């Protein structure tokens, strides 16, 4: 752009809307690419001059926008329809699997993402006062891969109840008797995707800290445990909980390292144990 703003040209928000420059899905993909490169180059101690160039380009990417009804926009133009229940949530890539938007670091954008996700689930616009239930998530939203993606999105946005509803939705509407997931034909995306989404409900590490139980529903809270989960930075995590509270955890790595840990609502710095 003449003012130096960088946009991906001639993009398309997958299977939805017109082709144009600066589609949010494309912008978010490039932001993630630049962020991943910058962190990898810094860790390896390489490409110092090129790191500066990439950081400058990242800073000039056209940013995410909040639209007229509070939604995270899908395009540069504010044309999102609050009653659109399209199956894709491509403009929420920055929430999951990306990491540009988070509750703690970008709360205004996270709130806008929640509004956009409610809209795609049929819980905004003319249905804004309709309770969010499994049954209200209808029509185009019932796909093998849609339930897991939205489960992971709700987990990243800290809503364990809605994340849990997405698991139940996949089992109720898009799982065959042999446990293959359907689109309605067989589609493996749902089987693979839901395991990743469940992991996001139990452990997150995308925002510079390890968070235990970020989004568990009430019916999981009584008692539970997980072992051997992996977190960014090469950490292995074990965890037990009772009544929604972590009562035990272990963090392992190749060598003892300090790490930020969010547990039971408290952020602390702990030292990992050496893997044996």
Regions from the language model: what does each represent?
Residues 1-2, 8-10, 14, 115, ...:
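Primarily short, surface-exposed interaction patches in extracytoplasmic proteins
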Residues 161-275:
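Non-catalytic C-terminal accessory modules of carbohydrate-active enzymes
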Residues 11, 54-59, 214-220:
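A glycine-rich phosphate-binding loop feature that marks nucleotide/adenosyl-phosphate handling sites
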Residues 1-8, 46-50, 212:
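Short, glycine/acidic-rich hinge or "gate" loops at secondary-structure transitions
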Residues 2-3, 91, 232-233:
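Short, well-ordered loop/turn elements at secondary-structure boundaries
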Residues 23-206, 247:
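Active-site core of glycosidic bond-cleaving carbohydrate-active enzymes
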């Amino acid at each position: 752009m003449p003012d130096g703003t960088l946009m991906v040209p001639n993009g398309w928000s997958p299977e939805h809307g017109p082709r144009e420059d600066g589609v949010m899905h494309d912008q978010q993909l490039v932001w993630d690419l630049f962020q991943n490169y910058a962190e990898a180059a810094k860790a390896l101690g390489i490409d110092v001059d090129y790191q500066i160039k990439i950081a400058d380009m990242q800073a000039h990417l056209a940013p995410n926008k909040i639209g007229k009804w509070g939604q995270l926009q899908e395009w540069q133009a504010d044309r999102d329809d609050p009653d659109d229940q399209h199956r894709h949530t491509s403009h929420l890539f920055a929430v999951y699997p990306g990491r540009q938007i988070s509750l703690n670091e970008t709360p205004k954008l996270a709130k806008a993402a929640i509004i956009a996700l409610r809209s795609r689930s049929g819980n905004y616009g003319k249905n804004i006062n309709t309770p969010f239930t499994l049954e209200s998530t209808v029509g185009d939203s019932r796909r093998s891969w849609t339930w897991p993606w939205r489960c992971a999105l709700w987990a990243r946005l800290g809503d364990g109840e809605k994340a849990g509803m997405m698991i139940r939705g996949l089992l109720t509407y898009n799982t065959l008797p042999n446990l293959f997931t359907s689109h309605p034909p067989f589609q493996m995306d749902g089987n693979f995707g839901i395991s990743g989404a469940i992991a996001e409900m139990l452990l997150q590490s995308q925002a510079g800290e390890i968070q235990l139980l970020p989004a568990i529903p009430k019916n999981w809270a009584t008692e539970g445990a997980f072992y051997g989960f992996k977190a960014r930075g090469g950490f292995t995590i074990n965890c037990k909980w009772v009544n929604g509270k972590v009562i035990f955890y272990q963090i392992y790595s190749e060598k003892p390292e300090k790490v930020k840990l969010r547990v039971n609502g408290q952020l602390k710095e702990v030292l990992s144990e050496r893997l044996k």
